[in-house]
Amino acid sequence: MTQMNVESFNLDHTKVKAPYIRLVGVTEGDKGDKIYKYDIRVKQPNQEHMDMPALHSLEHLMAENSRNHHDRIIDIGPMGCQTGFYLAVLNDDSYENILQVVENTLKDVLNATEVPACNEVQCGFAASHSLEGAQELARELLNKRNEWTEVF
């Protein structure tokens, strides 16, 4: 396989075992700050995917609630393949800390009564949401919490 610029294109998706959380890479800035990018894989690549309304709501819930557990979250966003999310954090090299942040955030999802910013003013596709779907995804991930560190 030819080496590509995008890290995930160099990952053999037939060998991974979802769910997992793995460090994708570290980017260091000119002043020494470091961005840690994580692959939060929810579904098994090429076998399963998240339905868009559930994925969209889980994105909103995780983006909003994760910042209650970590003050240096840069972004959390869905993968185009609908099998997971990317999480970027600033200057935190603790994998265990990130696992705890994700766990706490998913517990928040289970307790949510609404999807944040689920309206036409704050969201580009407000009609495509499912709180129940997001909560089911969170429940599935939490039920397999002991597997998150096993990528292959």
Curated annotation (Swiss-Prot):
A Pfam match: LuxS
Cofactor note: Binds 1 Fe cation per subunit.
BP-aspect Gene Ontology terms: quorum sensing
Top-level class of the enzyme under EC nomenclature: lyase
Keywords in alphabetical order: Autoinducer synthesis, Iron, Lyase, Metal-binding, Quorum sensing
Keyword Lyase: yes
Intrachain disulfide bonds: none
Single GO MF descriptor: S-ribosylhomocysteine lyase activity
Cofactor (UniProt): Fe cation
Reactions this protein catalyses: S-(5-deoxy-D-ribos-5-yl)-L-homocysteine = (S)-4,5-dihydroxypentane-2,3-dione + L-homocysteine
Enzyme Commission numbers on file: 4.4.1.21
Quaternary data: Homodimer.
UniProt-listed PANTHER family: S-RIBOSYLHOMOCYSTEINE LYASE
Family: Belongs to the LuxS family.
NCBIfam families the record matches: PRK02260.1-4
Name under which the protein is recorded: S-ribosylhomocysteine lyase
Source species: Halobacillus halophilus (strain ATCC 35676 / DSM 2266 / JCM 20832 / KCTC 3685 / LMG 17431 / NBRC 102448 / NCIMB 2269) (Sporosarcina halophila)
Taxonomy of the source species: Bacteria, Bacillati, Bacillota, Bacilli, Bacillales
